[in-house]
Structures are given as structure tokens and as C-alpha cells.
């Protein structure tokens, strides 16, 4: 986040997957094996006040870097999403939706003392109440079989094919980011991810013809991002990504997922001081 103030640019859309503050020493299951839920020191809670201050600080920076008609998406669970929503409201954002991402393949609850955690939340907000944000309503209706898309999305968690260059502990699935990008941006729009991780947002942006800037502090994940970006130079892999994304779109307008040469770009150039 230290770099963000030095970026002399405003983005059409921001997707943020900030720390959830859920690394508490617990265990979960992945591929049939017990694993720790700890993601790293960056995901450990520093206490309510410090966690809340952190969310407010980065959300304030992001609001400065958002175009007047741009929108921001922020993912989370009950561990952090209420703090994010409060900070958004206090900073002047207008929350449009709280998307419930229902995973159809969640890990089981090992303790058997409460309901299985199978959802995450994604807040979608515009810069202010008076902003005229972009929403591709017709496309969302089309990929939902001709009916209005609701705010509960049933999509799988990260699949094996998305781990070809390694696995980030909180990596988001490509179909999820693709839907978000298609819903709220146009081709050649600029997208920012201030917690880029392994750059699923960047991969989806590239595949769908958008411009992207990602910020990430961990060298390991930067290398993973570069490897994933390099993969896209293989036209067969890029075509495979389109096909996999299209499986989650019940539509006859499949040309939105066809591999094609990018349109000439005559838009804004990004500057980093």
C-alpha cells in the first residue's frame, strides 16, 4: 500500500482482497488433509482498533484512486467485512450490493460444533451516492439464462488447473473475478488490485481485454504472478481459460469468451512517480 499514494492515476474499477484477520491457529481440510488456517503474519488480527484503522486507511487511499464513476469490490468473511462496510460508509462510498459467494465445494467443518463455513462476501460500492456507475445489466442477465442475476453467486473455490504456477493461500477463482470484471467494466478500462497476491485479477483482466495494475509486497507471490502472466502467451492456455470461464455462463452470447486480438488502445496512460 506504500506505493499507492505515488500513483498519479484514477482507475475505473478496484478489486481488493484484503487480510481477513482469520489466522488464529485453527485447522481446516484441503484435498482430504488437515491443514492450518494460518495464511501468514499479514493475516493475523492486531486487535479491533488496529484492524479497523488499517481498513479505513487503505479504503481512503483507494477512494482517491477511483474515477468519479468507478466502483470498488472488496471481499471478506464475517471476520473483516463489517469493519470494511463501516469504513466505506464513513468515507463516503455508496454500497450497491453485498454479494454472497456460495462455494459448492467448501471444506468440511471438523469440530461439528457449528455450521460449515461455505460463503464469502463481496461488497460492491461506488465512489459516492451521486456517482453514475457502470453496470452491464444486460450481460449479467444474459449469462444468468435470461433472468436477473441475484446477489447470491454459486461458484466453486479455486480449482486444480488454477494452481499450475503455485498456490496462494487466499487465491480467488478466475470465474469469480471474470464475472466481477464483466459486470462493472468495459474493454480497455483500467483495474487496480492493491492486494494482488498471485494476480487472479490481473489474469482475468488480461483475458477479458482490460488494463491492470497490481500491488503486492511478498516476493514469492510476485514471482507467481509473473509466471501466470507468462503462461498467457500460450494461445492454447488462454483459450482454455476462456472455455473454463464460459462454463459458468448460461448464455448464447459466447463471443464474449472468444480469443481475439486486442482492440487498438487510445486511452489513458498510467504514471507512477
Where are the regions that the model predicts?
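Core catalytic lobe of class I
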Residues: 1-224, 261, 270-273
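S-adenosyl-L-methionine
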Residues: 1-5, 226-267
Amino acid at each position: 500500500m506504500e506505493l499507492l499514494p505515488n500513483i498519479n492515476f484514477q482507475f475505473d474499477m478496484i478489486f481488493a482482497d484484503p487480510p481477513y484477520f482469520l489466522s488464529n491457529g485453527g485447522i481446516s481440510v484441503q484435498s482430504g488433509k488437515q491443514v492450518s488456517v494460518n495464511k501468514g503474519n499479514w493475516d493475523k488480527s492486531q486487535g479491533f482498533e488496529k484492524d479497523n484503522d488499517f481498513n479505513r486507511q487503505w479504503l481512503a487511499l483507494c477512494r482517491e484512486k477511483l474515477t468519479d464513476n468507478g466502483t470498488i469490490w472488496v471481499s471478506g468473511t464475517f471476520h473483516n467485512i463489517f469493519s470494511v462496510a463501516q469504513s466505506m460508509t464513513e468515507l463516503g462510498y455508496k454500497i450497491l450490493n453485498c454479494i454472497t459467494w456460495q462455494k459448492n465445494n467448501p471444506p468440511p467443518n471438523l469440530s461439528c460444533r457449528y455450521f460449515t463455513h461455505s460463503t464469502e462476501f463481496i461488497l460492491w460500492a461506488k465512489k459516492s451516492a451521486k456517482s453514475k456507475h457502470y453496470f452491464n445489466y444486460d450481460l449479467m442477465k444474459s449469462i444468468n439464462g435470461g433472468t436477473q442475476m441475484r446477489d447470491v453467486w454459486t461458484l466453486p473455490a479455486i480449482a486444480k488447473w488454477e494452481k499450475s504456477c503455485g498456490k496462494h493461500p487466499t487465491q480467488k477463482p478466475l470465474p469469480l473475478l471474470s464475472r466481477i470484471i464483466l459486470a462493472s467494466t468495459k474493454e480497455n478500462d483500467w483495474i487496480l488490485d492493491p492486494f494482488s497476491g498471485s494476480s487472479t485479477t490481473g489474469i482475468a483482466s488480461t483475458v477479458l481485454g482490460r488494463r491492470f495494475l497490481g500491488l503486492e509486497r511478498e516476493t514469492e507471490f510476485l514471482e507467481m504472478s509473473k509466471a501466470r502472466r507468462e503462461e498467457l502467451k500460450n494461445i492454447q492456455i488462454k483459450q482454455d481459460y476462456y472455455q473454463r470461464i464460459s462454463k459458468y455462463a448460461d448464455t448464447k452470447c459466447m463471443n464474449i469468451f472468444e480469443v481475439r486480438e486486442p482492440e487498438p488502445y487510445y486511452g489513458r496512460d498510467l504514471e507512477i512517480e
